[in-house]
Amino acid sequence: MSVIAAQREWELAEVAQEVGAEVVCGSSLKANLDRDWDQTTQKEEALSLVLATLTQVESWLGSLPHAEQHPKAQQYLEVARQVKAQDVEKEQEGKATLIKGVAKERRISVEDGQMRHGRKSRSVRVDGDIRHVLHDMDSGMVRAVGVTAANAPEASVTETISADLERQAVTLQELHIDRAYLSSHWVRTRSPELEVYCKAWRVRQGKQFSKQEFHLDWERQIICCPAKLEMPFTPGGVVHFPKKSCAQCPLQAQCTTSPKGRSVSIHPDEALVVELRQRQLTQAGRAQLRERVAVEHTLAHIGHWQGERARYRGLRKNLCDLRRCAVIHNLHVLARSEPFLQAA
């Protein structure tokens, strides 16, 4: 309505009165509704009023003459429809209620259509975008950066970062990453020369034998259980030991309580997972993992300069802003470098 009001050179309140949508005028919609939000009935009344107002605005826009039709007005109306579709459902009685849970690809910002919900872990939620930084362990410089929506897999950013590295004619020799990037194309399609340093996934330690008690023979593609029963395996598959053998096994109580027998999942890149797990058991391996602290420091520095709130709307503009902060970081690193200090 504000678009049409500006086009007519009217006040928003005048247009709202014509439409019958006075509730949208004022400092905020929530203030105009003025409900006790702890009361279920009042929340339902407020939702019904908002939906009725949206219907009135849709009808009013459709009745406007062609000369007054404006692309932006239709664009804003589509945003409202999207929010309604993802957050509101009708019960059997026909009453509108807010959907419990979060819709897939849920839009979280009216202004920025690319922002999404995401999770770093079960307890840590991220709203908006996630920044990614490629830190050069030798020079301390940031070689490339990336931005993804919060609900996108973090590993998906590596394709665009690789394109930036190609323009710099840079080849990766070592990857010091966290576990979110283990599914990236860098790891999946790595050459034998590329070393990957990452903490391995934790092995569940219950009352029964853990996966580490099973021996993997990579030459024969055979897995051997603690009772010396052998079964073939394939990366990415699940090995099911025969239930009859498990039922007769003297170690059954220590291995499984399932009447179907013991099963073991094999990671698609199980060889790498085993290598990472064995490496972090050694003092030298743990020291190599600690080298990644420099990456976390770089992320903290850039986060300090850029802030935790996106300055712009859209991934492209926020990527540009992240690159700006990476340049500032690199200038600080350069200013602390020995050649620069000697020249000074």
Label each PLM-derived region with a short phrase.
Residues 1-344:
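Anion-binding and metal-coordination hotspots
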